Amino acid sequence: MPTITAAQIKSTLQSAKQSAANKLHSAGQSTKDALKKAAEQTRNAGNRLILLIPKDYKGQGSSLNDLVRTADELGIEVQYDEKNGTAITKQVFGTAEKLIGLTERGVTIFAPQLDKLLQKYQKAGNKLGGSAENIGDNLGKAGSVLSTFQNFLGTALSSMKIDELIKKQKSGGNVSSSELAKASIELINQLVDTAASLNNVNSFSQQLNKLGSVLSNTKHLNGVGNKLQNLPNLDNIGAGLDTVSGILSAISASFILSNADADTGTKAAAGVELTTKVLGNVGKGISQYIIAQRAAQGLSTSAAAAGLIASVVTLAISPLSFLSIADKFKRANKIEEYSQRFKKLGYDGDSLLAAFHKETGAIDASLTRISTVLASVSSGISAAATTSLVGAPVSALVGAVTGIISGILEASKQAMFEHVASKMADVIAEWEKKHGKNYFENGYDARHAAFLEDNFKILSQYNKEYSVERSVLITQQHWDTLIGELAGVTRNGDKTLSGKSYIDYYEEGKRLEKKPDEFQKQVFDPLKGNIDLSDSKSSTLLKFVTPLLTPGEEIRERRQSGKYEYITELLVKGVDKWTVKGVQDKGSVYDYSNLIQHASVGNNQYREIRIESHLGDGDDKVFLSAGSANIYAGKGHDVVYYDKTDTGYLTIDGTKATEAGNYTVTRVLGGDVKVLQEVVKEQEVSVGKRTEKTQYRSYEFTHINGKNLTETDNLYSVEELIGTTRADKFFGSKFADIFHGADGDDHIEGNDGNDRLYGDKGNDTLSGGNGDDQLYGGDGNDKLIGGAGNNYLNGGDGDDELQVQGNSLAKNVLSGGKGNDKLYGSEGADLLDGGEGNDLLKGGYGNDIYRYLSGYGHHIIDDDGGKDDKLSLADIDFRDVAFRREGNDLIMYKAEGNVLSIGHKNGITFKNWFEKESGDISNHQIEQIFDKDGRVITPDSLKKALEYQQSNNKASYVYGNDALAYGSQGNLNPLINEISKIISAAGNFDVKEERAAASLLQLSGNASDFSYGRNSITLTASA
């Protein structure tokens, strides 16, 4: 019940009187005189409210002083009686259970009974958490109760004055104002008793069905009855409806009044039937009051009846009023269906929540339906009143009665909801007492069991995917909205959890029921942030399957934050580091990519959680997340990956390292970088007017707000590093470095040492520096710079530029790969293979070897010097090529589809081949050209063949087979040996790598599919 001030009471009384005056304004003089006289008769009984205190009353919880002080503030007269309480109740109230009575002094409130009622509400309020319309708080105070009674009395008694007018006009009977007032007092006593009943055990659903049946068989009311029967099936909905059964009796008032065509006997019979057969004795006081008014009013006016019946049938139930309630039932059914699986896994919380929504939904539906019917009846009477003067006072009376009932309904609704919530809370408490475990934690256990069932195929295959013997999988079950909702409903927000983390073990495609026997220590401690795999005898994968919340303890406190508002606040006593002890003797994999390392603490401030990982002597792999880490890799060949999640803009620096494998890694998180962040969120749950906000930890994969964060990793004894998907920077040490750029346009410098640098995807720049380096461009348009030393450069796909530096002793391999590449050799002996595409090859001043295959595009060889340069046409027969001079260049054409076209440059252009004849001191010629079978063309043999053609006035071109100097399969062996020596020297390959690289550049003996013979090739000379 809301707190009502004296001013509001005065305003309500004034409004009721003004309404009556307005109705009277259009009436005749005799009507006005009658109303005035009736008002005078009832003034003493109706407008005087007295708090009666017997001499033997001392006061209980709400002290006598509180009652007296409150009555004074509200203008309620306080009287002390010399008689004791027993004598007064017999004289005035007839029973000790009545709260309000009527004497010649006025309307009296019996102080002992009021105090008893207050105590009952206060106990109920404490039991229910203080949330039912200020039960145990404001309603527990005398002021609110007294003021509410005063408001009800004022409204009802004002209507009684209008009832007297009807009596005088229609029947001339002699019904005194005191009789009407007594009937009103009986109504209020009954409604107060009904609203105060928290333990009524009658089944509301059964009564509702009976009521619909009775109304369906009652003349003029069958339409409304049918609609009531069409309510959702509420049978067996639960004991939560027990608190509503008494309230339903109030509906009888509206229906008895609404049947204006029924005679007095019918109305009386309907009242008795509704009261005794359907509602029992609960509505007796209300029915007595209504029957008394029926006798006084004589509602048989035909003009009013037609409009009234039509209005009631049309307006009785509005579907819009029940949409939200229907959704509530629908959701409850879905939750109940969802709960079936988890019941089997040992958790009944979802079913409990579904029951709560069904029970409170039934309460909501019933009360909403009652209120809707009451409102529609009142509206119907108001409509009828426009055609009849008699209808006007009837409308005012019904408005007063329905207003009183609606007030009781509203004041009782919250208590009903809380009653249901308390039952659910009792179930939870009993379960925890029996099992010695947190109920909501048990809910997460069930969720995790279902997760394991649903994802078994994936989880059981991780050991194969990562090539290990055992998988140790850590899973975080995050905040569950249904579990959180149940905690809020039952006022258990301080007992719930943000989730729970679990550890599971898999071997040979099977989940182990318990941890392996060799684990003597605690493997996983999420409170302290410790993970210990040091006992493991197997190669192991440590993987965080779902984002893991930061380590630490959650502390919760539930407090009241408003009139009906409660909040459960969360404090995290966090640990700022994860400490991981790795497998000692077996190579293992540590996947930290789902580890949350940033926790938002408000105002764009973040708490960082580092990873400290102590690995063993095996060949380990580490996948890092977006936060800082210290990796002590130990012995073995260890690899650290930054490309499995967004780890920011990466700079790897080994320039200051004093030991091999030591790097400082700086990462900038900001801009477009998204990282896993732990955040605190709130779930809000409503139980009627009570709202419960529960804070919990969750995570977001999002941008860092407002600023850039810089993270620093310290890596020790790490042999290989894989970058991010962004533009990374790598600066190598003076030792051997192995860097992978991964995706993005990377800048990689090996510096000193024999380095291996991989650009991977993106337009990368790789610089080997000093040392025998291997550089791999990968996809993209890359630039590879070999630096001093013997280098191996492979451009990969894309339009790449490869260049090497070094003196005459250097030996380098330059392989362009697919794309239009540019290859620049050194002063030493270089092996240049442009690959597919239209490439430029410049060998430099050393004795270089060029390589060309039939599937390549148009290559340009621009050789600047060297006295023993060679070209290997590895899969081409000289019978499939022709040579022709074009200015100072020599053009080699190759056959395509058995057609050799002189007008299409599809082979090789030898730049400045003939410049030496013009006095050029440089040697731009290739001293030996080999075909696949070891036959050789030299500059001299080619010159003679061209001169022969010219001197005999023949074509300006010459077939390769006609320009041979000598030929033998054995000529290939020295060439192969030279290629092998360059490969062996370049890039510091180990034995296996040498063989692999050599096989890529091996000469083919039978690669051509052409039919050889002068007439098998069609030669065209078109432009």
UniProtKB/Swiss-Prot annotation:
Positions of the UniProt region annotated as Disordered: 747-780
GO cellular component: extracellular space; host cell plasma membrane; membrane
Extent of the Hemolysin-type calcium-binding repeats: 731-748, 749-766, 767-784, 785-802, 815-832, 833-850
Record organism: Escherichia coli
Entry comment on modification after translation: Myristoylated by HlyC; the toxin only becomes active when modified. Mainly myristoylated, while a minor fraction is acylated with pentadecanoyl (C15:0; 26%) and heptadecanoyl (C17:0; 6%) fatty acyl groups. Fatty acylation is involved in binding to host membranes and promotes the irreversible insertion of Hemolysin into the host cell membrane. Can be activated by both myristoylation and palmitoylation, but HlyC catalyzes lysine myristoylation.
Name under which the protein is recorded: Hemolysin, chromosomal
Function text: Bacterial hemolysins are exotoxins that attack blood cell membranes and cause cell rupture by forming a pore.
Compartments it resides in: Secreted; Host cell membrane
Domain comment quoted from the record: The Gly-rich region is probably involved in binding calcium, which is required for target cell-binding or cytolytic activity.
Record field: compositional bias (Basic and acidic residues): 747-763
Any GO BP annotation: hemolysis in another organism
Note, other: The hemolysin of E.coli is produced predominantly by strains causing extraintestinal infections, such as those of the urinary tract.
UniProt GO molecular function: calcium ion binding; channel activity; lipid binding; toxin activity
Topology with respect to the bilayer: Multi-pass membrane protein
Gene (name only): hlyA
Statement: the UniProt record of this protein carries the keyword Magnesium: no
Superkingdom classification of source: Bacteria
Keywords from the UniProt entry: Calcium, Cytolysis, Hemolysis, Host cell membrane, Host membrane, Lipoprotein, Membrane, Myristate, Repeat, Secreted, Toxin, Transmembrane, Transmembrane helix, Virulence
Annotated TM spans: 237-259, 267-326, 364-410
PANTHER family per UniProt: S-LAYER PROTEIN
Entry-linked NCBIfam families: RTX_toxin
Sequence similarity: Belongs to the RTX prokaryotic toxin (TC 1.C.11) family.
Lipidation (N6-myristoyl lysine): 563, 689
